[in-house]
Amino acid sequence: MAALAFTTGAAAQATTDEPAPATGRASRTTVYQGSFFTQYAPRTALDIVQRVPGFSLDLGATQTQQGSVDVRGFSGTAGNVVINGSRPSTKAETLDVTLSRIPAQQVIRVELGPGDLFGSDYAGKSQVLNVVLSQQAGIDGNVTAAAKRWYTGYINTDIQGSALIRRGASTINVSAGTGRNRQQEEGTDDIRDVSTGQLVEHRRKHNSYFNKDPFVSAAWGVEHGADRAFHLNGRWQPSRFDLFQDNRVTPVGDPQHDDNLIQTYRDPVIELGGDVTRPLAGGALKFVGLATRRKRNDVDQYIQRSGLIEDNAPIDGGFRQSVHARRNETIGRVTWARSNLFGLSFEAGAEAAYNTLDDKVDLLEIDQNGQEKRITLPIADALVKEKRGEVYVNLGKTLSPSLRVDGGLNYEFSNLTVSGDAVADRTLKFLKPNLTIDWKPGGGWHTQFSVRRTVAQLNFYDFISVGDLSVHRVTGSNADLQPQRAWELRATVDHPIFGDGLFKLDLGHDQVSLLQDQILIVDDQGNEFSGPGNLGTGKRDFVTLTLDAPLGRLWSGLRVKLTGTLQRTRVEDPISHRQRNWSGFWPTWQYDLSIRRDTSALSYGVEFFDNRHITFFRTDEFDSNMNRGVFVSAFVEYRPTPRMAINLSLDNALDTHAARDRLLFLPNRAHPTAVFDEFRDRDQHRQISITLKHSFGGATGTRVASKGN
């Protein structure tokens, strides 16, 4: 318990080797000193963050339950981790990647507190973690080499390394990696006529996915204090993705034939960002600049044959699609914050962002003679530009040692134009208020209540039509799409359990207008597509339980963490006019249970995960994804020396399959003439991995930095 403490006013009297908590943070944060994490033998700051009791890493708005999304601007994309009290000036590099670049030896402590302690970007968040780094001069680093064996016998290898060099107030952090991740799976598709139940077609498939994301990143910082700092960072990643699919098709009543799906994507990204903080009028003035440049050069090919490859069957048709796009973003931001202005904490700021997307899609049908015929899409060539601005002010006041109120108002405005195959010009303006009440009623209990208005951003790619050859469909475009608006209500209650464990309960309700989903789109020629559009009012209610329990009384080093969510989403379907769930990853229930034990030289554990199926409600199909059982992974890690760790892990230990069930309506659900069910079963089988981790530098690899280290 000596490693865990609630901060007091004395915390401000830190040595020069240990940055002090900011004024007003005392008594509102839980501090975990470096010695607390020694039992887990962390190698990076990410390992430490993942071991903070009751804490779950939030990667920010660009990484959501729906996957990676394009969120423009800087203010609305924060996660829930800061480093030395500041947010990293990057968007291309996610929080987990940034944290994995920091050697654990450099971490003195972490501070867990409510979001208002760390600025307006985190207002309303019940938990934000501050990773405090050592100021001791020296060099620390890590090298990680991994190998994973797939069921085919293929072994994927990957290596990456990082180093942190500190001299006085200056810190340089560099990292690089091969970013190799090849995955293999096999499975079957069965298509049946719903009206008769008869099998129409059977397919046997083998897929090979290969992500090659080598990267080089570097960051330089000079920190003389919370109000005197400079940071510069950059990242280059020439991303590649390749898919090769073998597909043996057996139509009922017709001969077998072999098809192939080949995807070749080249999507490089480069980013340069930085910030400068200077004292002004008793507070801190901060400038942030960020420039990101992305390219897409994607080619999909579907090859059809008249028979089997082994019989030298010729190609008798197919499809080919190419996507060439440039996506650029430039951001400038200025903020001024003061911890005590007439008895209030105060922050005000402004942000400007300029975004462009230049995108061209070519979708071709290839006949048996190799002749290409262009398939007309509603919008296949367009240039999208957006000028976005936002100004805001946030105020907070501690009314008593146990009660604090924070509130703010954001004003967002943007001008968006579309040219090319479609023409649009619109100006959007929104007010976004927020209010948070943080209350500690006593007895170790902590609660937080918040309400805020949010406005979603339009995905630029929703303005461009595109085909998906893996499922033989086209998604239409919509130049008239509107951003959905929501009022979000949150309530959180937490309490320590079993010493350094935590009980946490989160409740939430979202009231959404103009919910973004799929609607029926008709082009000028009368062709009908499923595409992005706005529905009516949507509602979401959820409850999330987190139990992080140290069970050392039962068995030394034993710890169990359970996270479970129940939720309900409702919206009126645009075709049936019945209430249904939202499209996307909004499962009715999901859970994650991890059990691990840590000793001085050995750690081992097991993790269980599952969720209810989720559905994408298109106008021409119901596309459902599901697990066919619980997914289980296990690991054991041995540390033969203080600087070395060997990790052996088993993924998908129960050989659980995943599935996709597509209910297809021809031509669409509005007036179907035929309905088919396509059930896809996929299995990646068990995977065994071995990872070697080695630390170097002034501190050992089995402990984080201690005071004065």
Give a label for each model feature.
Residues 295, 415, 439, 443-489, ...:
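Surface-exposed extracellular loop regions of Gram-negative outer-membrane beta-barrel proteins
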Residues 86-114, 161, 218:
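Short acidic/polar hinge/loop motifs at secondary-structure boundaries
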Residues 13-15, 612-615, 638-709:
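C-terminal beta-signal and adjacent terminal beta-strands/loops
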Residues 329-333, 478, 482, 495, ...:
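Outer membrane beta-barrel strand-and-loop segments of large Gram-negative receptors
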Residues 46-87, 128:
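Extracytoplasmic beta-strand/coil segments of soluble accessory domains associated
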